A protein has these predicted regions:
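A short, solvent-exposed, low-complexity linear motif enriched for acidic/polar residues
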Residues: 1-160
């Protein structure tokens, strides 16, 4: 029971889970059970946000005739060697609203969030596919991570 004024969550896979033995990484975090497309085996780490596609702004790939971009953003700070830390903690304040949880109630409150995926590209940093068609573990990934932290906002809370 209680009155909640906000929520805090992390985008990414925390460092403790990232360095735990593979046998302890179950469900969607098990790289051998369908989660391999969101895991870097070469870097022993998870991809937090993945975007791939084509853009008129990306450089031309002559063999394919396409203009591809590939963004695989991860890194949690490193296990034995320091790396970038692209884990992002997001705090959503409910403002003047309160989510009231009561044992006697048959329904739980709901916080409705908006996810503006475009913010990944045009948040505090405008992403330029011309200059950065491929982003993975390089320093530029921190710009993308700072952008995805900004993509989630509160629409409203209701308690009925």
């Amino acid at each position: 029971e209680g009155d909640y004024t906000g929520v805090v969550f992390t985008i990414g896979v925390d460092s403790l889970k990232s360095v735990s033995p593979l046998a302890e990484r179950t469900g969607v975090l098990d790289p051998s059970a369908g989660g391999s497309d969101m895991y870097w085996s070469w870097n022993s780490g998870y991809i937090f946000v993945k975007m791939e596609g084509t853009s008129p702004g990306a450089p031309l790939d002559t063999p394919s005739g396409q203009r591809p971009f590939m963004y695989h953003v991860g890194l949690f700070g490193g296990y034995s060697t320091p790396t970038l830390n692209n884990l992002k903690e997001v705090t959503i304040s409910f403002g003047t609203s309160v989510a009231s949880v009561r044992q006697a109630k048959t329904t739980a409150p709901e916080a409705h969030l908006f996810v503006d995926v475009l913010k990944v590209l045009n948040g505090s940093t405008n992403i330029d596919f011309t200059l950065n068609p491929v982003v993975m573990g390089n320093p530029y990934s921190a710009n993308v991570a700072n952008n995805y932290k900004e993509m989630i906002t509160l629409d409203h809370v209701h308690n009925d």
